[in-house]
């Protein structure tokens, strides 16, 4: 913002020449405050004036005094407000500088999408060496000390199942493998963040959701091969509940502890919530079909179901699974191609910090004196402007001369604005220094995913023995509550860690995106895989699980509707998840998933 000045316009033409009709200075509608009298003090910049005569310039023209238009300076408070708004605008432009070209509709679609997906929000600095990358991974979190439980859990499992040592309890294997997954989840989240530095936020969120659901997919496939259909369905429903209630609730709570309110991109959040609701409704349609036509006495057995309704349920489940996969492809196309700009991260998040509390009398007096000095400053600035106008010599007014501008409050505000612009320019060039190079990041993600999958497999195999040795536990509760917590540990750690860094949109894309991927991708893939290998798995879920899942999705929709979050909303979601866990502890379970038995599905449909 330049210092306040008065601008001199070029002199008028010959008096005999008619003035231009559209000239703002000759317009009769010109406001009176724009027409300056000869007595008005003039402060103007040195504008060049052409006083040379040309042969083609026509008759000689008489020079008239230059017209002067006063550009009054704003008061200090208004100047400071303009400086703050300008700084915010420039900071927003600096944060989205690297992705602004991708929003231009002129480039081709491929170039636009590639730029949005693979262009990091900040400039990436020099990558470290291999040794530096390994050191950064090892020292990334103190939870890595728990990595010692990986060989311990593996040794106990192999000694019990392959060594024939029955003295080793399944509870010990379960506890060791459960603890071992915690640091693996932390390393996976660290590697995912390093990969997200070099990718767009959308692709990073999709990567988080994919790696987080790898455990659920492996567990579901192994349970399906063993024809444990109830475990498959309970683990998948529990994964969705864990993501949208526990993970999302902890993200809101952790971010709300640091920020009073965090802004959410309402368009993307509402779209994801609506898509999740549609996916859950589509998954629950076969269950609604079954309970609508079943008798109220509940005397339907497997033979009757196999003769009529069972074949219809299988065919309906297969058709719904194919349609859900098509919907998932459309979701990827929408998120990563046609409307990728909805998921672009902005530098200005809109989060609200907690106000600084004024706790004692001295601070209150300082606060009051500050406003009093501010008011006196504005009054002194107004008085100084009047005095400076009166101090201009009359000769300068009469001759149309110029008076050099003096420094005052407006000039100081302008210097402050220039200083803010300089700081924003330095912030714009700030680099994001990665802690790992690309090769080590990819290697860590692959190795960590494999370790998580193997450790989770040992964990699942020890559940049955642990349930038998502890009658208070039920296999359904373990599959609905414990397995999803273990399976979602990776994205749980990542989502909570980035929400504290004021990246709540990434947390939502991880939590809600993971649930969408389970509903639209994992469940249909498991259903079609069961169809391929001849297992009679349907989308007929437990009735109580179906009701709880539907109500939970509705609550999450209402939570994301206002586009802002706080710690109280996070606590509500977490408490709801705990209430559901307590209710399922006493739930005896249902046999709807095993009504068709574990016979070949061809005998049911044929």
UniProtKB/Swiss-Prot annotation:
Lineage top rank: taxon: Eukaryota
This protein's record includes keyword Ion transport: yes
Biased composition regions of type Polar residues, renumbered to the chain: 36-56
Keywords, in A-Z order: Calcium, Calcium transport, Ion transport, Membrane, Transmembrane, Transmembrane helix, Transport, Vacuole
Ranges annotated as spanning the membrane: 138-158, 171-191, 205-225, 237-257, 273-293, 314-334, 438-458, 478-498, 506-526, 536-556, 567-587
GO molecular function terms listed in the Swiss-Prot or TrEMBL record: calcium:proton antiporter activity
GO BP terms in the entry: calcium ion import into vacuole; intracellular calcium ion homeostasis
UniProt note: phenotype after gene disruption: Increases intracellular free calcium level. Decreases urease activity. Decreases concentration of the polysaccharide glucuronoxylomannan in growth medium. Decreases RNA level of ECA1. Increases RNA level of PMR1 and PMC1. Sensitive to cyclosporine A in combination with; semi-permissive high temperature, or calcium chloride. Resistance to cyclosporine A in combination with cadmium. Normal cell wall integrity. Normal capsule size. Decreases virulence in a mouse intranasal inhalation infection model. Normal virulence in a mouse systemic infection model.
Subcellular location: Vacuole membrane
Spans within the Cytoplasmic topological domain: 1-137, 192-204, 258-272, 335-437, 499-505, 557-566
Membrane topology, as annotated: Multi-pass membrane protein
Residue numbers spanned by region Disordered: 1-110, 376-434
Acidic residues bias: start-end ranges: 423-433
Pfam families from the UniProt entry: Na_Ca_ex
Record field: compositional bias (Low complexity): 18-30
GO cellular component: fungal-type vacuole membrane; vacuolar membrane
Name under which the protein is recorded: Vacuolar calcium ion transporter
Annotated source species: Cryptococcus neoformans var. grubii serotype A (strain H99 / ATCC 208821 / CBS 10515 / FGSC 9487)
């Amino acid at each position: 913002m330049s210092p306040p000045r008065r601008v001199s316009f070029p002199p008028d033409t010959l008096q005999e020449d008619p003035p231009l009709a559209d000239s703002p200075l000759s317009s009769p509608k010109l406001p009176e405050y724009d027409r300056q009298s000869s007595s008005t003090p003039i402060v103007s910049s040195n504008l060049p004036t052409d006083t040379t005569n040309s042969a083609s310039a026509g008759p000689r023209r008489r020079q008239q005094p230059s017209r002067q238009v006063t550009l009054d300076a704003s008061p200090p408070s208004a100047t400071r407000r303009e400086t703050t708004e300008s700084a915010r605008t420039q900071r927003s432009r600096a944060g989205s500088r690297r992705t602004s070209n991708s929003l231009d509709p002129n480039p081709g679609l491929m170039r636009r999408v590639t730029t949005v997906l693979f262009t990091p929000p900040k400039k990436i600095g020099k990558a470290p060496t291999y040794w530096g990358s390994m050191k950064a991974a090892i020292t990334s979190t103190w939870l890595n000390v728990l990595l010692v439980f990986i060989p311990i859990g593996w040794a106990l499992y192999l000694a019990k199942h392959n060594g024939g040592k029955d003295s080793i309890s399944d509870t010990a294997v379960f506890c060791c493998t459960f603890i071992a997954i915690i640091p693996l989840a932390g390393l996976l989240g660290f590697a995912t963040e390093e990969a997200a530095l070099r990718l767009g936020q959308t692709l990073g969120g999709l990567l988080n959701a994919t790696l987080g659901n790898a455990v659920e997919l492996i567990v579901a496939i192994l349970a399906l091969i063993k024809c444990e259909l109830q475990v498959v369905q309970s683990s998948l429903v529990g994964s969705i509940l864990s993501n949208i209630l526990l993970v999302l609730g902890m993200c809101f709570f952790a971010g709300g502890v640091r920020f009073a309110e965090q802004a959410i991109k309402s368009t993307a959040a509402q779209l994801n919530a609506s898509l999740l609701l549609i996916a859950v409704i589509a998954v629950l349609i076969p269950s609604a079909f079954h309970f609508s036509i079943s008798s109220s006495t509940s005397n339907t057995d497997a033979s009757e179901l196999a003769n009529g309704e069972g074949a219809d349920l299988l065919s309906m489940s297969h058709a719904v699974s194919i349609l859900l996969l098509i919907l998932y492809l459309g979701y990827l196309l929408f998120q990563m191609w046609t409307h990728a700009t909805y998921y672009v991260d902005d530098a200005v998040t809109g989060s609200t910090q907690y106000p600084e509390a004024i706790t004692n009398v001295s601070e209150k007096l300082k606060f009051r004196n500050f406003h009093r000095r501010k008011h006196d400053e504005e009054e002194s600035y107004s008085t100084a402007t009047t005095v400076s106008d009166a101090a201009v010599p009359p000769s300068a007014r009469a001759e149309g001369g110029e008076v050099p501008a003096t420094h005052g409050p407006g000039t100081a505000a302008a210097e402050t604005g220039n200083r803010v612009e300089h700081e924003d320019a330095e912030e714009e060039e700030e680099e994001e220094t990665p802690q790992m190079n690309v090769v080590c990041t990819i290697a860590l993600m692959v190795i960590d995913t494999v370790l998580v999958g193997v450790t989770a497999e040992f964990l699942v195999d020890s559940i049955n023995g642990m349930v038998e040795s502890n009658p208070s536990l039920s296999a359904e509760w373990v599959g609905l509550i414990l397995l999803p917590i273990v399976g979602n540990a990776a994205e749980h750690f990542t989502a909570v860690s980035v929400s504290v860094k004021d990246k709540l949109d990434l947390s939502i894309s991880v939590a809600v995106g993971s649930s969408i991927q389970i509903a639209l991708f994992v469940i249909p893939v498991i259903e079609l895989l069961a169809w391929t290998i001849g297992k009679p798995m349907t989308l007929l879920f437990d009735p109580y699980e179906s009701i709880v899942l539907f109500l939970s999705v509705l609550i999450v929709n209402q939570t994301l509707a206002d586009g802002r979050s706080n710690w109280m909303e996070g606590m509500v979601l977490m408490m709801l998840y705990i209430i559901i866990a307590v209710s399922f502890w006493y739930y005896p379970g249902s046999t709807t998933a095993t009504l068709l038995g574990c016979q070949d599905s061809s005998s049911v449909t044929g």
